Amino acid sequence: MEIEVVLGIGEDAGPKPCSAEIESAEKTLKDDGVVQENGVRVSDNGEKKSDVVVDVDEKNEKNLNESGVIEDCVMNGVSSLLKLKEDVEEEEEEEEEEEEEEEDGEDEEEEEEEEEEEEEEEHGYCVGDFVWGKIKNHPWWPGQIYDPSDASDLALKIKQKGKLLVACFGDGTFAWCGASQLKPFAESFKECSKVSNSRSFLGAVEEAVEEIGRHIERVLVCDCAEEKKHEFDSPLVNNAGIKEGVLVRDVRREMISSLLIGKHGEILKDVKSFAETVSFSGLLELEILKRKVSAFYRSNRGYGLTEYHEPQSVPGLEDKNNDDDDDDEEKNVNDGLQWRAKRSRVEEVAALDHEESSSLQRSLEKCSGFPDHRLPHRRKEKSITEIIEKESAAKVRFETEPADGDVKSNVKSGRKKTKRHDEVNGDLENVTTTALWRRRKSEVATIEDGGNKQVVESSKGKTSRKKKKMDVDDGDDDGSGDKEESEEKEISDLEINIDSTSLASLRKKVRFDDSVVERSTENGETATQTSKRERKKSKYLSPDFLSDFSRKGRKKSTIESESSKVSSQSQVDERVTDASDSLMEVEEDTLDKPCEPSSDNGLGQEELSRELSNAVDFLRLGATPKEMQDLIRVAALGTQYPKDSSSRDMVREFMTIYRSFTYHDGANHKFLGSYDSSDKEKEELSEMGKPVTKGKEKKDKKGKAKQKAEEIEVTGKEENETDKHGKMKKERKRKKSESKKEGGEGEETQKEANESTKKERKRKKSESKKQSDGEEETQKEPSESTKKERKRKNPESKKKAEAVEEEETRKESVESTKKERKRKKPKHDEEEVPNETEKPEKKKKKKREGKSKKKETETEFSGAELYVTFGPGSSLPKKEDLIEIYEKFGALDKERTDTVDNNFSAHVAFLDVADGEKAFESSLEKCPFTSNSTVKFRLKYPNERTEEKKTEAEVAETTMEVEYLKKKLDEMKLLLDGCEGGMTEEVKVKLEGEMVNLLEKVIEMRSS
């Protein structure tokens, strides 16, 4: 307990303390002091003190000794001194602790630096190295190592101890990677550069390769010329993991020198090989070579290689439809960068939802500081080249002027795609109208008729409401004027680029629309009106895709049209007397009019000429003949055809039309008659276009049974006829090709021959089965009277009927031959036609006979053959060497003389047997070949050749069978060895089965 007393200035005495106060003072000084006579003593505590304190203590002791009473002021001074002492001690202790902490921190930093250096020595990666980094759920990505001191605030937040800061190329992201997640860039380039084909990955690889090339060229140039160092100053880093203002780290010189290993002469050699082959093994190899050449140019002439810069977009021409998408992307860029920066942390990526992660990944594709043309989601901008192309294409336009001045032609650009929701009959229909659909519906076709042009206007694509209104007002005369006004407003001209569309599409756009109908009003005016919209059909069913300008397509169209005519005529039983009425006659004087195409192919030819006229009309309107000539010349002279596929298609179609009309039906048709169509095609055309004749009608009146029986007998006898009859039949078939010029002559014989050939082709069974089937059918069809009569007949009556029918057929054939002799055809025509109209069975027989004759001629060889067999591993002589060695013995068959690499053998064919024997004897005496292994000689005679072939085949069969038996015995032996004394039931059953099979095989061999 302390008592404070305030003394006034100049007071000599104060209140004297009581005994209690003296006792308290003695207690405070008990620990350090010594009690004297008066009871109070203060001593030093052993620490260094000041002189003031000592003097005060001495004075206090003196006062105490003198007076023996301690005053309050003295007590206060003692207490303050004690407190001051304690404060000084505490400050000294704190300073000592701070010094110790600083020393510990310095030691820790030194330890960390030492650890980092040890880690770098362990994994071998340094700051500035190019590496491939692998993060989970991402491919190997190119990047560069940076110092942790260069890390941004975002990177420091997710810093991980013992990992390296890697700044990724391309997308501007970063990652903290361990040594196990990294690979050297150059050593692993071939492996890691092919892990993905995405656009972002390829862009990152290209950027990394360019950066390495910059460092390589910098090292090469700076070594040669120090004054050019400023040209290769390091740029600023633009990455989310690196703070602003940091320059790109320099690469170690050891790494660059490892890429530049090689002799000086190899650079020139590599440049020559690249120039000749235009191929390189990798992108890095090409970049290194390019930088070497660029450094060489900089050292000699002061500047490097010419650089190619990709075309930049014109600002202000963005696609406005994608503005909203771009705004959303800009909002999510910051969040996306953070997410991509934290992609090394698997836990945070897994915590994100699927929708959030997908949206972030989509927004991350755009990073600041990188060109927009490398981003997958960028604004659609028009380049300067596209604008120039459109301006040049806009010069060629398809414009139509109004005939009476009523319709105004206005050139309009393609409008945007719009969606309208219209209500028709209470139902909502979503109609999506595009610019292409509007063009098709707003076609304006010009039709030339006698030199006067009539403009037929088709209304533009209307909505369903307008169509409904027009349908309702069809019967009203008052509404016609309103419709005309609305139609005049909606009609617009077409703007067509000739060079960007093919000939088929251009012809389709000019074609007259069948849905347009002209309607006349009371005032005499005409109004165009479109019919109701039909269901949309596939474009591949349109005549543009179905029409074929080739010879085969025209033949099919004519056959189809004529076959439909014949079928309709046969159903209605119309009587057509002349064949010239169904088919157009071919004019004989085609040379007098070479420009007019002949129309011998009927309606198909008319359609083709209409198609050609449309195409030529359009070419006259759009592409000039000069332009077409230039395109054809470029296609003929150019080593590589231009990449414009539209002009290529147009040239191809024009040339097909031109060639078909020149060589098929044009001026050269008379000279190239054989190229036009073969005789077989003419026969098919004549068969399809042949009308029904009177003779056929007479036969139809007879009974069906008799007709079928005659057909069967005729077909059966035609096969067994002599050569004379075969010639007659051939002459009958030749007559069919001339049916166009001679109307009704010999039609009955031709029809019978056609029917017989058809029956023979369809007939797959034998003649006996067909005759039995025909007899059964004939027994069912005739009436009861005919059945009774046939039962009465005996076999002799059947023979008589057959003889009568044979006489009739012979008479018909004789008449046909007489008529054909009058015509007097050239001999070569007579020979060609029968060969084409022969029966397929006879053709097959002739082919087989020809093949057998060829084989006989090939195998026929009267000389001897010397076979030389070499040991395995020896080199075989060439054919020329064999001929030189054995030609001195006699004449050789050089075609048969050859070496066989598979068998290590060679055979020499001598035309004379005696020469072969001489060569064989001399070869046995002295071998003409120099080889390490043994050489065997064998002579074959002509009569032994077939016998030896048979024996060789038999020997091969026997060896195969013996090998099979040996194999089976080995399998059985293995089964027994595997049993080891104890045989299971399964093994026993299997062994019995093998033995049974083996015995059966032995029995078969013995019997054979």
Swiss-Prot record:
A motif (Nuclear localization signal 1) lies at residues 786-793. Pfam families: PWWP. It comes from the Eukaryota. Keywords: Coiled coil, Flowering, Nucleus, Transcription, Transcription regulation. A motif (Nuclear localization signal 2) lies at residues 809-816. Residues 84-124, 307-339, 399-606, 668-874 are annotated as: Disordered. Residues 127-188 form the PWWP domain. PROSITE patterns: PWWP. Disruption phenotype: Delayed flowering associated with reduced H3K27me3 level on FLC. The triple mutant pdp1 pdp2 pdp3 has increased levels of FLC, MAF4 and MAF5 expression, but decreased expression of FT. Residues 87-122, 321-330, 473-490 have a biased composition (Acidic residues). A motif (Nuclear localization signal 3) lies at residues 841-848. Residues 78-122, 804-824 form a coiled coil. One of its GO terms (cellular component) is nucleolus. This is PWWP domain-containing protein 3. It comes from Arabidopsis thaliana (Mouse-ear cress).
